[in-house]
Amino acid sequence: MFAKIALVGRPNVGKSTLFNRLIRSNRAITHDMPGVTRDRMEGIVRGRNKRPFGIIDTGGITLDGHAAVAEGPAGIRGFEAEILRQAEEAIAECVAVCLVVDGREGLLPFDEHLASYLRRTGKPVLVVVNKVDGIEKEDVLTAEFHILGFPVLAVSAEHGHNLRWLESEMRDLLPEEDEDGIDDDAADATAVASADADVDADVETEGGTSASETEEGITEETVEDEPEAPLRLCMLGRPNAGKSSLVNALTGTNRMIVSDVAGTTRDSVDVAFEKDGLSYTFVDTAGVRRRSRITDTVERYSVNSSLKSTTKAHVTLLVLDAVEGITSQDKRLIELLDERKTPFMVLVNKMDLVPAKAREDGKRNFRDLLNFCQHVPLLFVSAKTGYELRSIVPLAARIRRECSVRIPTGQLNRAMEEVITRHQPPVVRRVRPKFYYMTQAESQPPTFVLFVNDADRIQAPYAKYIEKSLRRLFGIEHAPMRVHFRSSHKKNSEK
């Protein structure tokens, strides 16, 4: 694995903006409101012909008593304790730490406590004085931070001042013996990509991912389609459906902060793990609510990031609450994924809370309500007890394989003859549609084009029959599929 460096500091000192700048992406949500980041996020800092290294963005540490940092998390409760735990785990994983401070606010007592705490870890520490907008301000704004006893560097994450120098200083903190790192495929699997997402009126996606979205140096990434690339699974669902609990249960870690408070997760967070020699990445996302219920700007950014994450995953895991049943928002999310032909499966979580006598009726109700997208797998699970969790990853891997299916044109046309012979298309306006040939236009998902004499005469039930037949003949049971009908005359011109 790559050597890692952690970004640690108080809330709102600019750690997430700095993280986005260093990895040249818009992964972390940034906002002027303190405490936006909660779960730690990881990315890769790359440079042309330069050694890559990992970087971890941690939540802002804020406690009622400054001494609590020096004494440890005992007695600290709520999100503050979980954020501190996440920061401690990040520091333990890293070879060095960047203590990020605010040059405009100056040295605060809490910064000194954090520095004292980091000194006891024995890790190399670099004090990064952020929000210093030019070289003329460096001496004035950084002078008092030298008292901390660590090397000091002034930067501006927002305007890019000294960021190349910062990268160089961070590389100097890396141990010489860790030169190899991991391969490109594994490295890319730990970075969340950025992709555009369509917006539906019932789902709030406005506002963008972060204020730094248009900054110079920010680039977009895409998920890898190669079969050997680690499987990426995106968790999606309403707030408090148990997405983070499922990630923790599936990976056997406490990687995600979990609480009964809806909206605990804000960023879309990658959690990589290995099982049976194979690598996987779960992307935990913020809960998606209806537009009318979103009043917080940070939540708007979080929802937008959640929906974008589905376009960057191989398979999306839509998590529902077994106790609450399917809500109108759940239905809208299912319809949205189905319309976009997103590979997904539905996980009905919290089955341990459903009385034993009511479980079968509850399962039947879920199946009936999801009858309109029969190809989508439906699993009843429990993050708390582990019920049916072992079925999730193998089924997701199967969906990914089905999405990559490529069928030769000759085989397709032989299948088309068999399907049409078995069931002729109905006569429409005194004319029976005539099929010429079929081809596969693309995969991801499988897309088939059938050329006929008049595409307008193909009715919806017969189109559904064609799709079901293709699924049966070629083993595409759960992946989304597109079937297009094109008009073609003797001159092979398309309408």
UniProtKB/Swiss-Prot annotation:
Q: Where is the EngA-type G domain?
A: 3-178, 231-404
Q: Where is the KH-like domain?
A: 405-489
Tell me the keywords, alphabetical order: GTP-binding, Nucleotide-binding, Repeat, Ribosome biogenesis
Q: Which InterPro entries match?
A: G_ENGA, GTP-bd, GTPase_Der, KH_dom-like, KH_dom-like_a/b, P-loop_NTPase, Small_GTP-bd
Q: Where does GTP 1 bind?
A: 9-16, 57-61, 130-133
**Signal peptide, first to last residue:** none
GO MF terms here are: GTP binding; ribosome binding
State if Cytoplasm is listed as a keyword.
no
Specify residue ranges for compositional bias: Acidic residues. 213-227
Q: Name one GO biological process term.
A: ribosome biogenesis
Q: Is-annotated flag, keyword Lipid biosynthesis?
A: no
Q: Where does GTP 2 bind?
A: 237-244, 284-288, 349-352
Give the record's family classification: Belongs to the TRAFAC class TrmE-Era-EngA-EngB-Septin-like GTPase superfamily. EngA (Der) GTPase family.
Job of this protein: GTPase that plays an essential role in the late steps of ribosome biogenesis.
What is this protein's record name?
GTPase Der
Q: Which organism is it from?
A: Nitratidesulfovibrio vulgaris (strain DP4)
- What high-level taxonomic lineage is stated for the organism? Bacteria, Pseudomonadati, Thermodesulfobacteriota, Desulfovibrionia, Desulfovibrionales
